[in-house]
Amino acid sequence: MSVLYPSLEDLKVGQVIQAQARASPMMPTVMPTLPASMASAPPLSELYPNLAELESYMGLSLSSQEVQKNLSQIPDGDNMVITSPGPGQVTAPVSGNDLGVLRAEIKPGVREIHLCKDERGKTGLRLQAVDKGLFVQLVQANTPASLVGLRFGDQILQIDGCDCAGWSTHKAQKALKKASAEKIVMVVRDRPFQRTVTMHKDSSGQVGFFIKKGKIVSVVKGSSAARNGLLTNHYVCEVNGQNVIGLKDKKIIEILTTAGNVITLTIIPTVIYEHMIKKLSPLLLHHTMDHSIPDT
């Protein structure tokens, strides 16, 4: 299994680091005693390969210091071994431990959540049937549904032990209405129709795509968006894990502008998105959808 990277930039920088590490002579296990007249050894952080040539790699404002702070420090001791990332391990020499990447992660597998109703008997959740499956259409802000971490596009596999495959939207809403106010047990799969794309701003603060009414309409040639495979005819669901569905383009651009250098978009194909939100008014999406920044 190959090593995984959040973005193409991370992959390329990681390859440079690994190539330089392999080319560097291995240090002997037993270090000879040096005469006092010789210069002292460089600090351990300088044992990393020289990454100065990456200063403006792929249009990024990328310095050796920025890359090295995202790498594991070499441990103290006489025996030092340079290790490569293991198969299936995610490594991010450029993105580092970016919170946006973590918040946007679409986890594999399924999980169980316990939902309740508020004092009005509401969960703050709307469901929509798509291709014989049941999906989250709307999560209202400051409701039980938002507090348990449900997101637009999550697939509901079971409600209180009943399989939801083949259910209509009406049957799903009826089941929620009849469910206990104290505890509703759901089995959920994270957003199967969506995927994430991690990109990096260039020196002018751009990642290289344009949106119209929340939909990606063009991608700039040679940009980080193009390099990382961002597609047109997809809607932006999240920016760094924050839901932006129903927001005006101006607000989405403001969120992108004020974000850090690493941008992770969660996107969904137009045909799926438009089916998911049919019969929902734009005002409902704009004013009631949970647009808060999720916990990691």
Swiss-Prot record:
Domain PDZ intervals: 112-191, 196-271
InterPro entries associated with the record: APP-Binding, PDZ, PDZ_sf
Signal peptide: none
Gene Ontology BP terms: cell population proliferation
SUPFAM superfamilies xref list: PDZ domain-like
Pfam short name (any one): PDZ
CDD domains recorded: PDZ1_syntenin-like (cd06721), PDZ2_syntenin-like (cd06794)
One Gene Ontology cellular component: cytoplasm
Keywords of this entry: Cell membrane, Cytoplasm, Lipid-binding, Membrane, Nucleus, Repeat
Disulfide cross-links: none
GO molecular function: identical protein binding; phosphatidylinositol-4,5-bisphosphate binding; protein heterodimerization activity; protein homodimerization activity
Main location: cytoplasm
UniProt-recorded name of the protein: Syntenin-2
Organism: Rattus norvegicus
